[in-house]
């Protein structure tokens, strides 16, 4: 039996001298205000126990990590037809690249780059008003984490809406190819709000637990997705979850994961645990600098890498 709390504490101790490393995302004004000298880690094991250290109870903007939850909703709604509109291949380009999109006729490379996530949001929006789609996501994440206090930070959403020119360009470009079915402002309104979900490491580690437990949420006992779908979402997180740093993350950490420019990373150790780390300073490819290091240390200490201990 592993001493998970001991491992979590030792990782936190290792990160303490390095607080403040990396560069906070400054192109979203609200994120630029976040104190970089923070680090939190939470692990929720498949028996439902959560272990925390550091700033694990401080809410932060989960940003692109929300794409995992939106993809889960879209697959529940549209099934495999989702893949008619978005691919499943790593991009090798920056998360907001428009060049690849033009070359591939408006079909984004995968659901975790911005263009792909916007298409996924468009699918979830089908049959809904924007407010209803936002509400559906919020209810879903609260249900997964078993926590009704999770909320959306409207200030962050407005900040993104005011500065998200590249996302407007991507959305209009895909609309011109017929791969966006709703008005751009509706789809992006939902997208900016989903990215502004505010969660703690503890909440996020619980929300991702269904992916570590064959699609079943051990907190509620309910099946969220099939075993097969959980496996496939994990596969996409492993290959595409960290922008053009996905290969490097697989090499060093060896766990399915999804990062966000708010400094969070949600990772999955299938059969063992769901993990959330957060530190606002980002590395050169937009992933949490300390978060990535902490997960590499975790994989080494636990032997949880999907490629073997």
Curated annotation (Swiss-Prot):
One of its GO terms (biological process) is glutamate biosynthetic process. It catalyses: L-glutamine + H2O = L-glutamate + NH4(+). Gene3D superfamilies: DD-peptidase/beta-lactamase superfamily. It is an enzyme of class 3 (hydrolase). Substrate binds at residues 64, 114, 160, 167, 191, 243, 261. Keywords: Hydrolase. It holds the Pfam family Glutaminase. GO terms for molecular function: glutaminase activity. InterPro entries: Beta-lactam/transpept-like (IPR012338), Glutaminase (IPR015868). Its EC number is 3.5.1.2. Belongs to the glutaminase family. Homotetramer. This is Glutaminase. It comes from Agrobacterium fabrum (strain C58 / ATCC 33970).
């Amino acid at each position: 039996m592993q001493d998970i709390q001991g491992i979590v504490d030792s990782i936190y101790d290792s990160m303490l001298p390095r607080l403040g490393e990396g560069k906070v995302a400054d192109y979203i004004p609200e994120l630029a205000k976040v104190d970089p000298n923070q680090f939190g880690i939470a692990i929720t094991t498949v028996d439902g126990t959560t272990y925390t250290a550091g700033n694990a109870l401080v809410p932060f903007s989960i940003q692109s990590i929300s794409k995992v939850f939106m993809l889960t909703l879209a697959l529940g709604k549209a099934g495999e037809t989702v893949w008619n509109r978005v691919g499943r291949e790593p991009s090798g380009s920056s998360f907001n690249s428009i060049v690849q999109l033009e070359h591939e006729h408006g079909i984004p490379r995968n659901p975790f780059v911005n263009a792909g996530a916007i298409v996924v949001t468009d699918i979830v929006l089908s049959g809904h008003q924007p407010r209803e789609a936002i509400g559906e996501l919020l209810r879903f994440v609260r249900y997964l984490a078993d926590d009704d206090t999770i909320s959306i930070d409207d200030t962050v959403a407005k900040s993104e809406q005011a500065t998200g020119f590249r996302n407007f360009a991507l959305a209009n470009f895909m609309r011109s190819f017929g791969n966006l079915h709703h008005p751009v402002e509706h789809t992006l309104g939902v997208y900016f709000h989903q990215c502004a979900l505010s969660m703690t490491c503890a909440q996020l580690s619980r929300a991702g637990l269904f992916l570590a437990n064959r699609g079943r949420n051990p907190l509620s006992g309910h099946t969220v997705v099939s075993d097969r779908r959980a496996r496939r979402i994990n596969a996409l997180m492993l290959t595409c979850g960290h922008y053009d740093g996905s290969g490097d993350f697989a090499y060093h950490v060896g766990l399915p994961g999804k990062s966000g420019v708010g400094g969070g990373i949600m990772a999955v150790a299938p059969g063992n645990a769901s993990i959330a780390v957060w530190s606002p300073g980002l590395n050169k490819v937009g992933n949490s600098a300390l978060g990535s290091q902490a997960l590499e240390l975790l994989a080494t200490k636990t032997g949880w890498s999907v490629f073997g201990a």
